[in-house]
């Protein structure tokens, strides 16, 4: 099904123009009408143009009438321009059918839109890293993106790793039995841990109670991950959630003086501090295989033994 896809750059400058162009061509080859923003390849220092250029690109994406507004890449840059975004224009665009999709630094935009308007955006792929690969794009990523843009996606599932963490929140909307979880009517939200934790104390972090918070990151040692989780913990963000779902944490290196300090230990430590259920293994993050997740959407989290499901197409 042919869709209008608008590609823009709200964060870091495109580094690999060949990958960017390859991604555009792949989307066109799928039959979509691809419109590339006039400043998509702009560069100012590490950014895709100065703050005004990137703000204008966001607002052009909102005014484009596209079915999908897809970022070229993540990186850094959105947090510094959050005050300049016209959130009413973004909400109107979403109401008219534009789906804003991105990953990584895009978490700042998604959290801000949710906090300011309650509108749903999508955590998903980016052009350069996901569609612009030298090899064929990941099948699961491509299929999830297709489900997103055609409106066919109703949820996602994954296999939990063989790590026993036994605590579980048992409250309103939650059921716990041997090897089973059912959490209903919970807002799905989250994204990149470093970006999300940087929003604590600002008006751009949504005040979600009883939600399902998903997290991912890249290049962060487990002690840094723990420090950011501690910030969310002490700020009261984690206490209000029904579940914390860890995606993929990649590209970090353990050192000798860690002496056994690993990510699994961080997650077990976190579980000991909160009542919410902590799950692992969500296929989302700075990885080729990533699902698409509706940020701000009411969802159902179901676990049966080691099979986990996030469902938003069924009520």
Predicted regions and their residues:
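ATP/nucleoside-binding phosphotransfer catalytic cores, i.e., glycine-rich phosphate-binding loops
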Residues: 246-315
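Internal helical hairpin/lid segments
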Residues: 203-256
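N-terminal amphipathic/basic leader segments beginning at the initiator methionine
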Residues: 1-22, 157, 162-172, 183, ...
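Short, acidic/small-residue loops that bind anionic groups at enzyme active sites
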Residues: 87-112, 116, 120-127, 277
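N-terminal glycine-rich "phosphate-gripper" loop used for MgATP/nucleotide binding
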Residues: 68-84, 103
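Charged helix-capping and loop-helix junction motifs
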Residues: 50-54, 227-232, 258-266
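Conserved anion/nucleotide-ligand pocket segment
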Residues: 120-194
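ATP/NTP phosphate-donor binding region
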Residues: 1-65
């Amino acid at each position: 099904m042919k869709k209008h896809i608008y590609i823009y750059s709200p964060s870091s400058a495109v580094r690999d123009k060949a990958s960017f162009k390859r991604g555009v061509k792949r989307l066109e080859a799928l039959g979509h009408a691809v419109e590339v923003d006039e400043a998509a390849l702009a560069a100012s220092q590490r950014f895709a143009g100065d703050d005004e250029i990137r703000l204008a690109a966001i607002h052009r994406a909102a005014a484009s009438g596209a079915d999908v507004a897809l970022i070229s890449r993540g990186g850094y840059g959105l947090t510094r321009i959050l005050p300049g975004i016209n959130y009413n224009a973004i909400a109107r665009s979403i109401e008219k059918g534009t789906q804003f999709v991105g990953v990584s630094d895009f978490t700042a935009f998604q959290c801000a839109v949710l906090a300011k308007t309650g509108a749903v955006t999508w955590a998903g792929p980016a052009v350069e890293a996901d569609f612009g690969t030298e090899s064929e794009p990941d099948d699961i990523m491509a299929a999830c993106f297709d489900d997103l843009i055609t409106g066919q996606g109703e949820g996602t599932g994954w296999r939990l790793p063989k790590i026993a963490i036994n605590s579980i929140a048992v409250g309103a909307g939650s059921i716990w039995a041997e090897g089973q979880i059912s959490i209903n009517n919970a807002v799905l939200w989250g994204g990149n841990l470093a970006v999300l934790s940087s929003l604590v104390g600002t008006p751009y972090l949504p005040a979600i109670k009883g939600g399902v918070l998903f997290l991912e990151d890249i290049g962060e040692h487990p002690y840094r991950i723990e420090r950011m989780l501690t910030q969310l913990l002490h700020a009261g963000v984690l206490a209000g959630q029904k579940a914390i779902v860890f995606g993929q944490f990649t590209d970090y290196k353990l050192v000798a003086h860690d002496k056994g300090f690993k990510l699994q230990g961080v997650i077990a430590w976190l579980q000991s501090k909160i009542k919410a259920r902590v799950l692992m293994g969500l296929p989302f993050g700075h990885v080729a295989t990533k699902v698409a997740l509706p940020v701000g959407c009411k969802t159902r989290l179901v676990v049966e033994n080691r099979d986990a499901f996030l469902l938003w197409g069924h009520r």
